[in-house]
Amino acid sequence: MPVLGALLAVAALAYGGAALAGYGTGELSIPGGGATTLLRAAVFATLAVHLGELAGARIAGPGPLPHPWGRGAALLGAAACFGQIAVLAQVSRLDLMAAYSTREGGLLLATANGFALAAAAAGPRRPAWAVAPLALVVVAEAWRAHPEAYTPEYGAALTVVHLTAASLWVGGLLYVLRTLRLRPDGDGRWRMFTRYARLAGWLYAALAATGLCSTLRRLPADVVFSTAYGRVLMAKLLLMAVVSAYALAAHRRLRRHRDPDGAAAPARAELVALAAVVAVSAVLTVVPDPHWLSLR
């Protein structure tokens, strides 16, 4: 029940976040914004589950592994992409074939195809074959997120790194926590958790650097609190502060007490906070470009 409640809260945040953030800004509401945000959050979550599973299996090392979720996640991600195309067709008053021919529709179709190929490759013998189609998903989503006329290639490159690092962090943590329940050996559990914590430190640095560059590039300083984009970004930063606190608490217990069970409690709270970050990140991709209201 707590897990279901957390998922429902995250879904509600994704669905209503864009409208809430845009209240009083004077910006136009986004047609179909709630449904688009919810579906985009599903894309981010399923990408994280699959990429995190591929990385987590290497981090876990020898021993029992949890049941793979990669194929199901990839199929759900493909369905979420097709759902976005349907919403695009409805709000634009286009038929599906016409929606496919638009820039966003074509990139969503490429993303869906990447997920479908990843699902086909996610067999028990060679699961790493899913890496290439998942890379297609990341690149297509990065290009879709940057339709602006000003140097979109720089924004897309930053998003590729940011989305990959975020997916490995969230999905890797989920996989490690699932594996932890199957491993009775305390020392082996500690080594697995330590390997993940080391990787997470590098991923955090990549996220911080790309996030800062993207913010400086996309958000003019004079509209930080007067646009939906600025407000959502501030909310994301606050959530990341919460995530950082939980991550540090887990790392401290691992380092000082070599206690994987004690570290698991703040790590689970970190995962819940990261789920909220995923939802807020999806909202960030839907709200209007803040440059329209900037005086600069």
Region roles according to the model:
Residues 1-296:
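Polytopic transmembrane helical bundles with strong interfacial aromatic enrichment
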